[in-house]
Amino acid sequence: MRQIITHFTDNDLYTFSCQYYIMQKYPRAEVEYTFIDRNKTCYPKGFDKLLQEQIDYMAGVTITDQEVEFMTEKLVWLPLWYFTFLRGYRFNPNEVDINQDEEGHLSILIRGKWFSTIMWEMPILSCISELLHTLNGDVANYNLEKEYAKAVAKSEKIFGAGLVFGDMGTRRRFTYDHQKLVLKAMKHVYDSKPWPGRFTGTSNVWFAMELGLTPLGTMSHQLISFEENVSGVFECNYNVMRKFSDVYDGNNGIYLYDCFGDSVFFNNLSKRMAMMYSGLRVDSGDEEEQTEKIIAKYKSLGINPATKQVVYSNGLDVDKCIAIHKFCNGRVLDSYGVGTHITCDIDNAKPSNIVIKLTKCRITEVREWHDCIKLSCDKGKTLGNQEKCKYILSLIG
């Protein structure tokens, strides 16, 4: 099988912004990530060996001068010394342990220094998706002209509806080539004439560079999941907001607030932090309900919600985005990040429903290990040690 990931920055922007944050705040932290397949897929026999081959290839993937030049130009909030670090960074396949049982289920654990292991999430997920679609014949049946036409039609619908819209589809993309095709179609449509909507770019740093787009992304849930073990569930959001703003001095101002549900976050959101951050990201729960809660919280702090960004990203399709946009009706600065519906909406191909989540951590190599969990604004939806999830839910009430 050919090598799938050949570019160092074929990765989401938040990987880099979180990595630098970790280097600044928790440079000695060690973690464990776990692969979760929500579809409980039975992968073809030998899939683990093919995936291991892709993992081994990653040892030779290094950042280029061109990539460094692009990132230093676009990501001015990252210091130059960080790119010196990236020049020396090497993917370490020994951090990844892959197993496949007799039924075909995959088990993947990633363990090591947090600042190092964070780089694996996106390459592993996108490799799994592309390998599976290749092995089950989806790639062989791919109709390029048809898929390009679908991407054009979808783009026209998006921008015609006035949506502020970006791609977040690297992790579960059909293939590398298909994500590139979709982004080229979106850019072509957007550049063809003035539209009510706006194309904000892509979370994929490589494609942003190659296609002349804006790289998008700020942070991920893992920062809050880790912090809960440092400062507790009721203070972790505030402390991540404070530390993240310390690191980036007000840049990267979209906060992902739902890691332990909305009440924990809103009850501890100060006016200072609400003003420091340009907006919030809605990644779970009912979008209309969450919008009303966000608006009410901003108003209670004396802040005009219409000046604040709200990024919606909870498994959306275009029709859902349009419905949310109509509901917002200018009351917030709404925008949309869509993944699978953009990069894996292929006829007769079932998208993967896979994630890699932080499940254990310790603040230094000499401290004890703790379980990391993630709740959400979706009732009953939890990730991680279920006993701890139940305990934290009992505290939240």
Q: Which residues does each PLM region occupy?
A:
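Glycine-rich phosphate/ribose-binding loops and adjacent secondary-structure elements
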Residues: 2, 211-397
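Ordered alpha/beta subdomains of enzyme catalytic regions
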Residues: 1-240, 245-246, 355-397
